[in-house]
Amino acid sequence: MAAPYKSDRRGLIWICIFLGSLCDIRAEQIRYSVPEELERGSVVGNLAADLGLEPGKLAERGVRIVSRGKTQLFALNPRSGSLVTAGRVDREGLCDRSPKCTANLEILLEDKVRILAIEVEIIDVNDNAPSFGAQQREIKVAESENPGTRFPLPEAFDLDIGVNALQGYQLSSNDHFSLDVQSGPDGIKYPELVLENALDREEEAVHHLVLTAFDGGDPVRSGTATIQVTLVDTNDNAPVFTQPEYHISVKENLPVGTRLLTIKATDPDEGVNGEVTYSFRNVREKISQLFQLNSLTGDITVLGELDYEDSGFYDVDVEAHDGPGLRARSKVLVTVLDVNDNAPEVTVTSLTSSIQEASSPGTVIALFNVHDSDSGENGLVTCSIPDNLPFRLEKTYGNYHRLLIHRTLDREEVSDYNITITATDQGTPPLSTETYISLQVVDINDNPPTFTHASYSAYIPENNPRGASILSITAQDPDSGENAQVIYSLSEDTIQGAPMSSYVSINSNTGVLYALRSFDYEQFQDLKLLVTARDSGTPPLSSNVSLSLSVLDQNDNTPEILYPTIPTDGSTGVELTPRSADPGYLVTKVVAVDKDSGQNAWLSYRLLKASEPGLFSVGLHTGEVRTARALLDRDALKQSLVVTVQDHGQPPLSATVTLTIAVSDNIPDILADLVNINAPIDQEDSDITLYLVVAVAAVSCVFLAFVIVLLIHRLRRWHSTRLLQAAGNGLSSLPASHFVGVDGVHAFLQTYSHEVSLTADSGKSHLIFPQPNYADTLISQESCGKSDPLLVSQDLLEIKGDSSLQQAPPNTDWRFSQAQRPGTSGSQNGDETGTWPNNQFDTEMLQAMILASASEAADGSSTLGGGAGTMGLSARYGPQFTLQHVPDYRQNVYIPGSNATLTNAAGKRDGKAPAGGNGNKKKSGKKEKK
């Protein structure tokens, strides 16, 4: 029981609200009255005063008249605030003969989106005089008619109403006829001619009368028609209609030519007096345009289109007359039935074409009116919009509807809407009209730029050109206009103390990252950048993304040979190998590194050239130089090898080193043999030199030939003189040469002199090795006294006569153990015995002696040399040298492809003296001290 009671209370509440809204609507209607036929601009009423507004505020408040496409009868005067006539107001044209004529219009207050209804009653004035359809009318009357017979007269029409309408008729005075006016049920007055006295055709065949119609206006208006009464022979029967009134209902829009009905009248007379014809009687022009009457058959057909919206009812007067002229009257009442032939009309009265996406729900977008000219259910209209749109419709006053925002708009999802408003009536079949409203959603900056990737990785090869494009970074902003204009920038970081902006830059508009300098992989391998994308909205929004820039290594570094180090003076090192070495004996090891990485740092070693092919081999990956076969007696003492070190880059880079290997089992043999070794001549260099000499000679001989011919005689004499001077002066001193160490390694340096004794007829030379002068001596004078020369000539031995100058055979200290030899052989047992020196100082002394002898044999242009940190010797000599231990190249040397470093096998030297080295312990100690 409680539920129905609660439901009834809700119903009562809604009924009260509805009745209250009706009261409000009625309270907002304004009524005016105005007479018709006023001049244009005539004041109808003070609208501003009735609205409670100042006259000048109508335009500001957006007050205007809205209509549904009909002719505007009224207008607003924005200055006075009055409602005035916009043109001629014709009551008869608007309302025909309706007793009350009103014009309805709506006033729109745009600032409040409110509709105000105004009803203007148009008061009739006497502006139309009564008129007859025909100015003349002939009535045929039988002369035998009895007094009292009535004859219908033509009716007059007056478009005015009320007092101004037709009030009565008057007939001109005569002796035979009088006027009687009858009033029908519809209030229309019908004049009739009444025969008062008998007629005599032979006395007067035609009677002329004047019928006057007048209205009740002030002043009175009237109209006249001439009535001609023609007397005929007797026709005592008039036609008679089968029905006093004919009723028919037809649907509008019947096809033209459709027969509506057939009227029928009969006349009992015979002959011409009984022949009946039909015609319309006193019809308006509009009816004559819609209907057609067949005068012989009485068929009424549709002549024009029937439109219920123009008129739903037609009253047509018809008459039938026989041959002599007797007439009968009847009515045809045509009711036009409405069909759903008019689609609803939608008139947009207020529209917002653009709206911000942040607008709140309930915001009014448009106000429109819906009208259907049909009636009944055919005129009931419902409006709808698609369900998927964020809008809704709301009905307001009368047939007005509002389009509102229902959900929050998002321009990034939909930037514009083409809203279809469908107005559908309830007819059968229903008709509909679609109206389109375009709405542009205005963007606000509510979206930050979004990068296409969560992070970026870019790669650039080193040695890139400055300004090279690295990567294009793209960020999308779904907003529009300035809100979508993205500006790119880099974070202000530093790299190795330098600002990031000195390394890379980014195009603020395109997001293309450029390199501002050439990168070096060996300097750094990667950069971490932070890219910011900022839009141009207010306030601006931004996003960041990380960028990892990796520098790719290129093969831009040539392999660097650590051992043997290439001397700066052009000499080559000397490696010592016993002639009794077995195949596979480790002679030395070429050690190289490459600053590049990866494949660019993979090194391979190859034997490029050898003075004795097949004698030595080089490890492809280790660089170890080993004997490929046993050494033979015919193998030369001095072997020259050219080893190339090549990386695996593209293109590959390489470096070469020249090794000189001295092959002997005994030190004296080395000294004796090196004296007679001539430096090999590089055939390729010789060929190049020959080509250069030939080219220079070919160019110069043309210019110098004549000079040479003139001077050849003097040159011969000068040459003879020089020979004589040389014979007289004795031995000439030659420039000193010196042994130097390279790459920061101080090797011992020995200075000596070459003296050549030449006479004009001598065929031999004497090599003299006088006592060397030391700046940093191997054995200082303070500690060891004066040393004997390594080699002396026979003449010098005779002069000095000192047996101490004779060379003693080497003792057992002059043995190299396998641990003291260059290369990785230090891993072998250091106690190996033999004829090689077994301490560092003896090795150095031996190398000095070997190199001195080799230099003399090469005529002062040695091809043997010692690189810094090697066991080799240099053939360049100077006045001073610094004595240090020859560094062991195996210490802290990186071998590509290996995790091992070369060990120092000379540790025994630091711990204790090797066996058999007693004669040299003091010297070694001196050297360490220095």
From Swiss-Prot:
<keyword id="KW-0812">Transmembrane</keyword>
<protein>
    <recommendedName>
        <fullName>Protocadherin gamma-A4</fullName>
    </recommendedName>
</protein>
<dbReference type="InterPro" id="IPR031904">
    <property type="entry name" value="Cadherin_CBD"/>
</dbReference>
<dbReference type="Pfam" id="PF00028">
    <property type="entry name" value="Cadherin"/>
</dbReference>
<feature type="topological domain" description="Extracellular">
    <location>
        <begin position="28"/>
        <end position="691"/>
    </location>
</feature>
<feature type="domain" description="Cadherin 6">
    <location>
        <begin position="569"/>
        <end position="682"/>
    </location>
</feature>
<keyword id="KW-0677">Repeat</keyword>
<feature type="domain" description="Cadherin 5">
    <location>
        <begin position="452"/>
        <end position="561"/>
    </location>
</feature>
<feature type="domain" description="Cadherin 2">
    <location>
        <begin position="133"/>
        <end position="241"/>
    </location>
</feature>
<dbReference type="InterPro" id="IPR013164">
    <property type="entry name" value="Cadherin_N"/>
</dbReference>
<keyword id="KW-0325">Glycoprotein</keyword>
<keyword id="KW-0130">Cell adhesion</keyword>
<feature type="glycosylation site" description="N-linked (GlcNAc...) asparagine">
    <location>
        <position position="544"/>
    </location>
</feature>
<dbReference type="GO" id="GO:0005509">
    <property type="term" value="F:calcium ion binding"/>
</dbReference>
<dbReference type="InterPro" id="IPR050174">
    <property type="entry name" value="Protocadherin/Cadherin-CA"/>
</dbReference>
<dbReference type="GO" id="GO:0016020">
    <property type="term" value="C:membrane"/>
</dbReference>
<dbReference type="GO" id="GO:0007156">
    <property type="term" value="P:homophilic cell adhesion via plasma membrane adhesion molecules"/>
</dbReference>
<feature type="compositionally biased region" description="Basic residues">
    <location>
        <begin position="920"/>
        <end position="930"/>
    </location>
</feature>
<dbReference type="InterPro" id="IPR020894">
    <property type="entry name" value="Cadherin_CS"/>
</dbReference>
<feature type="signal peptide">
    <location>
        <begin position="1"/>
        <end position="27"/>
    </location>
</feature>
<dbReference type="Pfam" id="PF15974">
    <property type="entry name" value="Cadherin_tail"/>
</dbReference>
<feature type="region of interest" description="Disordered">
    <location>
        <begin position="900"/>
        <end position="930"/>
    </location>
</feature>
<keyword id="KW-0106">Calcium</keyword>
<dbReference type="Pfam" id="PF08266">
    <property type="entry name" value="Cadherin_2"/>
</dbReference>
<feature type="domain" description="Cadherin 3">
    <location>
        <begin position="242"/>
        <end position="346"/>
    </location>
</feature>
<feature type="topological domain" description="Cytoplasmic">
    <location>
        <begin position="713"/>
        <end position="930"/>
    </location>
</feature>
<dbReference type="InterPro" id="IPR002126">
    <property type="entry name" value="Cadherin-like_dom"/>
</dbReference>
<feature type="transmembrane region" description="Helical">
    <location>
        <begin position="692"/>
        <end position="712"/>
    </location>
</feature>
<feature type="glycosylation site" description="N-linked (GlcNAc...) asparagine">
    <location>
        <position position="418"/>
    </location>
</feature>
<dbReference type="GO" id="GO:0005886">
    <property type="term" value="C:plasma membrane"/>
</dbReference>
<dbReference type="InterPro" id="IPR015919">
    <property type="entry name" value="Cadherin-like_sf"/>
</dbReference>
<keyword id="KW-1133">Transmembrane helix</keyword>
<keyword id="KW-1003">Cell membrane</keyword>
<feature type="region of interest" description="Disordered">
    <location>
        <begin position="803"/>
        <end position="839"/>
    </location>
</feature>
<keyword id="KW-0472">Membrane</keyword>
<feature type="domain" description="Cadherin 1">
    <location>
        <begin position="28"/>
        <end position="132"/>
    </location>
</feature>
<dbReference type="Pfam" id="PF16492">
    <property type="entry name" value="Cadherin_C_2"/>
</dbReference>
<feature type="domain" description="Cadherin 4">
    <location>
        <begin position="347"/>
        <end position="451"/>
    </location>
</feature>
<dbReference type="InterPro" id="IPR032455">
    <property type="entry name" value="Cadherin_C"/>
</dbReference>
<comment type="function">
    <text>Potential calcium-dependent cell-adhesion protein. May be involved in the establishment and maintenance of specific neuronal connections in the brain.</text>
</comment>
<keyword id="KW-0732">Signal</keyword>
